[in-house]
Every structure is written in C-alpha cells, then in structure tokens.
C-alpha cells in the first residue's frame, strides 16, 4: 500500500511545487528523488527537463546508476551524472566514467569526500555557505553546468 501511495505523494508534491514556482516566477524546480527505480523515482522523473543522477563509486552505486539510466532513457529524460565521494574508490569512479562515456552521458562533476559536509549538516548550514573549499567550488561548477544544460 505504501509503495502505491508514495508515487502519488511525489506527484502531489511536484504539482504543488509547480504552482508555487509559477506564482513566484521561479526558473527552476529541483526535486530530490529517492534511490532505486520504484514508483517514487518514476513519479519524481515524470515531466522532468533534466535528471541529475547522483552516484557513489560502489558496486551498488554502479548497479543503481545503470538501472536509473535505463528508466530515464525509457522516458526520454536528458541526464547528467555526478559522482559523489569519487575519491573513496577511484577504480570504480573510472568504471562509472567509462560507462557514462559509452552511454553518451556526461559526468558533470566529481565531488570529493570531505568531512566539511558532515560539519555543515551538523551545523544545519548548506555546505556552500559553510565552506569556501574545493567541495563548494565543485558544487558551484556543477550548478553552472546544470543551468547551461537547461537553457
């Protein structure tokens, strides 16, 4: 029952976000979907202009990435990939990069592991406001890449 309703909840939240964005004349609606390929993921991808696929260099991360790429392709949704904590397993990060290259999908960013993220979360402050380090620069570059893709 929860699985069936979770997709409906995502659709309801997305519709409300669209109304708010139109009312406030906002350019973007950013929807953070769950991992996997279940109903909530499909609902969060429905009607999306772009999917930013976040992955980590683990075997399960690679497997989940391959599956969600197939879902995005099925629905015709353009994709960018971001490898989070890419430096915890550079061999798997290279596997992800090679797979994306073979699939014609851009790896838009490789975010390094950084304890400053945990510090920012504990402080309740977005990492881009908490730190001016490498991770903030990478996130800023990723945002620029996303906005260029959407124009």
Language-model segment annotations:
Residues 1-7, 59:
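Flexible beta-alpha connector loops of hexameric P-loop NTPases
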Residues 38-59:
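Inter-motif core of Ras-like GTPase G domains
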Residues 71-151:
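C-terminal lobe/tail of nucleotide-utilizing enzymes
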Residues 25, 48-52, 75-81:
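Short, surface-exposed connector motifs at secondary-structure boundaries
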Residues 30-32, 52-54, 82:
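Structural motif
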Residues 5, 12-41:
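Switch II (G3) loop of P-loop NTPases
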């Amino acid at each position: 029952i929860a699985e069936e309703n979770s997709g409906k909840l995502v659709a309801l939240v997305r519709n409300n976000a669209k109304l708010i964005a139109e009312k406030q004349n906002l350019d973007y609606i950013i929807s953070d979907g769950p991992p996997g390929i279940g109903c909530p993921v499909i609902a969060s991808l429905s009607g999306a202009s772009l999917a930013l696929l976040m992955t980590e260099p683990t075997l399960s991360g690679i497997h989940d990435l391959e599956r969600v790429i197939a879902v995005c392709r099925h629905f015709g949704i353009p994709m960018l990939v971001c490898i989070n904590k890419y430096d915890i397993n550079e061999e798997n990060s290279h596997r992800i990069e090679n797979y994306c290259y073979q699939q014609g999908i851009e790896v838009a960013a490789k975010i390094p592991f950084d304890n400053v993220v945990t510090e920012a979360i504990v402080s309740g402050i977005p990492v881009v406001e908490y730190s001016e380090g490498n991770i903030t620069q990478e996130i800023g570059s990723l945002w620029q890449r996303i906005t260029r893709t959407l124009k």
